[in-house]
């Protein structure tokens, strides 16, 4: 079976969806599928080896100029291809991850319009490549925001199965101003109804998005979230190492952005540090920081300083895989108390794989993650005091921390490897996987 997996580059930032797409593409290959991971917009950036193709369709510079400069469509094709070179795209879009979604309303609608949009020539180029050179049996879309090409693909490759993954489309849509948001939601719903299947990692999140986009919830296909467990096979959790007792260390690993809820954790940490027995509790947080959120980070650091806790918390930047493993190896607890409905929770599975128990809000994909893995506690969402209560319970109970960490790690390492998701995907597409 030949599969083309269309993934969306994130302008040089470490992107959870990109990294998971890369891991899934590798696993699909190991299971016997001829899978091509094809980037759109920009090259993808991962924290391990990438299998993505080197050329890019819908290059970020090209689609922007096609949308904003009508005469650009008359520029010779060979010059446009120069703008799609990976090195140039990486340089030209190095700050694009800081672009506010509310400034992209027209471009979003144009991209979703496919052949009727300003990027029609890019639609034609991609579809011709799929039809004439690749001839795939199935095409996977990393989200429905990139699915404006579906009607053209349906016409030119009627036998190909089209599968989209719902994994964070809402986070982008929520930042679009009205009426762009409503129009985009309507169009995404139309495109979703033309897919053979919609994959979700969480039933709760999937049903919420189906209602929002007007999709039939019965057509959702649940493929539980997985990670590449290879980096964690020889990992020794802190709770199992012979280390002297020290301060309990709480960790956060996600984008530094309001929707990921760092402010909730900072407020909970300040609350927690005023409680008996928490005089030495520390907080380490890390994740990609866009220019538009530097003020947000400064606000959180200022809160810590005003509370007299500046020396007990640290921002560790955006580490690579080795740095992430080193950070997880020093943690006793983990929390990403998102403000939005989290569709995945990759960093949660990574923390559990490292034997670190989690304390999470009961919203989005988190209830299913915690209940299925048994590796943590759920608390009321958007409530820093409730989060502090959950953290305090485990700060004061090291035996429960060890037990939850052990249970969570065992579940992830035995049942949440990306190979299982690849097998389910292949079976859904009608092919027999190599392993069972």
Region locations from a protein language model:
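Nucleotide-activated donor-binding/catalytic signature segment of Leloir-type glycosyltransferases, i.e.
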Residues: 297-319
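Glycosyltransferase donor-sugar binding loop
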Residues: 282-299
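A short, well-ordered alpha-helix in the C-terminal region of glycosyltransferases
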Residues: 386, 393, 400-414, 421-424
């Amino acid at each position: 079976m030949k599969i083309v997996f269309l993934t969306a580059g994130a302008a040089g930032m470490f992107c959870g969806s990109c990294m998971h797409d890369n891991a899934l593409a590798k696993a699909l290959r190991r299971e016997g599928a001829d899978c091509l991971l094809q980037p759109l917009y920009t090259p993808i950036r991962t924290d391990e080896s990438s299998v993505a193709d080197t050329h890019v369709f819908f290059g970020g510079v090209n689609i922007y100029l096609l949308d904003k400069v009508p005469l650009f469509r008359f520029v010779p094709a060979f010059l446009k291809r120069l703008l799609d070179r990976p090195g140039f795209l990486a340089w030209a879009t190095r700050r694009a991850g800081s672009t506010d979604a509310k400034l992209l309303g027209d471009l979003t609608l144009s991209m979703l319009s496919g052949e009727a949009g300003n990027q029609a020539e890019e639609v034609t180029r991609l579809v011709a490549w799929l039809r004439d050179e690749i001839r795939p049996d199935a095409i996977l879309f990393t989200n429905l925001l990139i699915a404006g090409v579906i009607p053209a693909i349906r016409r030119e490759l009627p036998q190909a199965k089209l599968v989209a993954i719902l994994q964070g489309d809402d986070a982008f849509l929520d930042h679009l101003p009205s009426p762009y948001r409503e129009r985009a939601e309507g169009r995404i719903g139309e495109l979703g109804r033309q897919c053979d299947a919609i994959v979700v990692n969480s039933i709760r999140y999937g049903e919420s998005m189906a209602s929002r986009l007007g999709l039939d919830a019965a057509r959702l296909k649940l493929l539980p979230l997985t990670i590449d467990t290879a980096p964690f096979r020889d990992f020794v959790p802190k709770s199992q190492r012979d280390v002297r007792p020290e301060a309990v260390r709480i960790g956060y690993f996600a984008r530094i952005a309001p929707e990921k809820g760092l402010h909730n954790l900072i407020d909970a940490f300040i609350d927690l540090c005023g409680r008996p027995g928490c005089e030495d509790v520390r907080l380490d947080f890390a994740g990609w920081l866009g220019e538009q959120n530097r003020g947000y980070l400064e606000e959180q650091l200022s809160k810590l300083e005003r509370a007299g806790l500046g020396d007990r918390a640290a921002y560790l930047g955006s580490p690579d895989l080795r740095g992430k493993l080193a950070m997880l190896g020093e943690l006793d607890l983990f929390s990403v108390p998102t403000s939005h409905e989290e569709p995945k929770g990759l960093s949660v599975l990574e923390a559990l794989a490292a034997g670190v128990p989690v304390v999470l809000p009961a919203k989005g994909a988190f209830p299913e993650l915690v209940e299925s893995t048994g590796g943590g506690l759920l608390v009321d969402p958007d409530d820093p005091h409730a989060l502090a209560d959950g953290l305090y319970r485990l700060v004061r109970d090291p035996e429960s921390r060890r037990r939850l960490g052990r249970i969570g790690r065992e579940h992830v390492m035995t049942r949440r490897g990306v190979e299982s998701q690849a097998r389910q995907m292949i079976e859904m597409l009608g092919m027999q996987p190599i392993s069972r």
